[in-house]
Amino acid sequence: MMFMVKIITRKVKDIEPLENALLIEGLPGIGHVGRLAAEHLVHEFKGEKFLELFCYDFPPQVLVKDDGTIEYMCAEFYAIREPKPMIVVLGNTQALSPIGQYHLAEEIVKIGIEYGANFVYTLGGFGVGKLCEEVKVYGATTSKELAKKLKEHDILFRTDGGGIVGAAGLMLMFADLNGIPGICLMGETPGYLIDPNAAKAVLEKFCKLENIEINMEELEKRAKGMEQFIEKIKKFEEEMLKAAQAKPPSEEDLRYIG
């Protein structure tokens, strides 16, 4: 028995299809790396929202904003015309179930093609479980020719196999099935923090691959703020460890020794 997941789209603005556009996915994932990178593209290149997508496999809730109004769980499509045509997909969630992930990825690629996309980029994080002094960027692609191009830009490939979960992986599959090339870029991240530094590393590789320039000042500010936050955590942990080591055992502690 085949289960269908209902997806609703709502046009925010009528736009003409772009020509030879890049479809760029930046939905939430590990360290919010892809989302931060894609949001930065939209912000810096004045992206224009033209479509919203709602999926019945999104979390069954709405978010409440500071002013008391609600925010839907949805994906949003933005059109960028300069420095080159792009369709950027942002959102506050991904689908919850495997079947929902498949339907969502397929629909996003379908919409991208409808609006002129002929190349797909998916952006995300590569969880390593620890802080990274220098962020490495890993990649995956739909062809050997593109893999060679990634290597020329010092983008690494996993040597232990593994998979890419969610929209970042499935959109490459649906792009390939539709005869469209695609690349996934993943920045190393601890996985337990929102990571603007990894987003910056991913965006730098993207810009080199596409031969475009972008102002990174805003991301650099966020990365600096996160570094300061991490330093505070480290300092607090060190102080706690020193205090624990310096504290003599109490009588109660001694009762349990030997």
UniProtKB/Swiss-Prot annotation:
<dbReference type="InterPro" id="IPR038389">
    <property type="entry name" value="PSMG2_sf"/>
</dbReference>
<feature type="transmembrane region" description="Helical">
    <location>
        <begin position="163"/>
        <end position="187"/>
    </location>
</feature>
<dbReference type="GO" id="GO:0016020">
    <property type="term" value="C:membrane"/>
</dbReference>
<dbReference type="Pfam" id="PF09754">
    <property type="entry name" value="PAC2"/>
</dbReference>
<dbReference type="InterPro" id="IPR019151">
    <property type="entry name" value="Proteasome_assmbl_chaperone_2"/>
</dbReference>
<protein>
    <recommendedName>
        <fullName>Uncharacterized protein MJ1210</fullName>
    </recommendedName>
</protein>
<keyword id="KW-0812">Transmembrane</keyword>
<keyword id="KW-0472">Membrane</keyword>
<keyword id="KW-1133">Transmembrane helix</keyword>
<dbReference type="InterPro" id="IPR004426">
    <property type="entry name" value="MJ1210-like"/>
</dbReference>
